[in-house]
Amino acid sequence: MSLDLSKKVVTVRPDQTIVTKQNLPYYLGISTKTAGTLGLSMNLVVIPPGASPKAHYHKDFETAIYLLKGRVETRFGENLKESVINEEGDFIFIPQGVPHKPVNLSDSESALAIISRNDPSEHENVVHYEP
C-alpha cells in the first residue's frame, strides 16, 4: 500500500438505528455507506432484556464481537445444539457460515456489543437459519 494524502479520517456518530434481518436494533457505525470502507464494518448492537434474535448465518464474512455489557448465550452449529456463554469484556469470533442465535440472559438489562465484520455491507449477506 502506498501513501495517500488525499484521503481523510472519518468520524461516524452512532445516532441512527436500523432493525436488522436478525430483528435487532443496530446503531450504525462504520460501513461503505457511512465511511466509504472497502472491506470492514463496525456497529453497536443492543440485545433487549430477555431477547433473542432470529437464528442466522453470515454467508461470506467473519464476525468479531466485543461484549461491552451483559451476559449472552450464543447457540450455534447444526440445529443450534452447541452453546457458549459470554460475559462483559469477552471477545467472540463467529466464522462465516456458522448458524448462530444470541440470547440475552438478563430479564432486566440490555446487552451491548461492538460488532466488526470483514464485509462493508454486511446486512445484505445475512441469511436466516431454520433449525
State what each model feature region is.
Residues 1-39, 54, 128-131:
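A short, N-terminal "cap"/entry segment at the start of jelly-roll beta-barrel domains
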Residues 35, 60, 79, 107-108:
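Short strand-connecting beta-turns/loops that link adjacent beta-strands
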Residues 35-38, 47-51, 69-73, 119-122:
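Short, charged/polar surface micro-motifs in flexible loops or helix N-caps
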Residues 43-59, 96:
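Conserved short histidine dyad/triad with adjacent acidic residue
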Residues 44, 57, 76-78, 104, ...:
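Residue-level recognition of conserved beta-strand positions in structured domain cores
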Residues 52, 61-88:
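A short beta-strand-loop-beta hairpin characteristic of the jelly-roll/cupin
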Residues 87-88, 96-123:
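Ligand-binding loop in jelly-roll beta-barrel domains
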